[in-house]
Amino acid sequence: MDVSLIEKRLLSHPGATKALHESWGWMVYWVGGKQFACEFIAAPDAKPPYAGRHLLSLKCDPDRIRELRAEFPDAVLPGYYSDGRTWISVDVDQAGMPGGPSEELALDLCDMSYRLVFSKLTKRMQREIAETS
């Protein structure tokens, strides 16, 4: 899947920003000071099944995580370096390919991640973001 499509979708949300986490080489996406996504290539020596994969980590509903893991066991993994109960890592190279999630689904998961994180911001922060967008 073309990463520019992912970036465009992630940054289309009100108040969304991105910043490179230089020491890790990860692109991290934020809203209201909270991370809602990150895109990166896992180190070649990372533990399996993450090693060397191009991943997109997203916040996700726990029930939806179980469904996605059952449907795409090799393409949707427990969140890398995050709580696997509430985060997933999608193999970007498998999105839109046979056996992997569709590009549309991957983009919908980006939207869900934003909504989940935005909903946990204070009401004041939500208003400020809405007013400046």
Question: What residues fall within each predicted segment?
Answer:
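Charge-dense, helix-prone N-terminal extensions
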Residues: 1-133
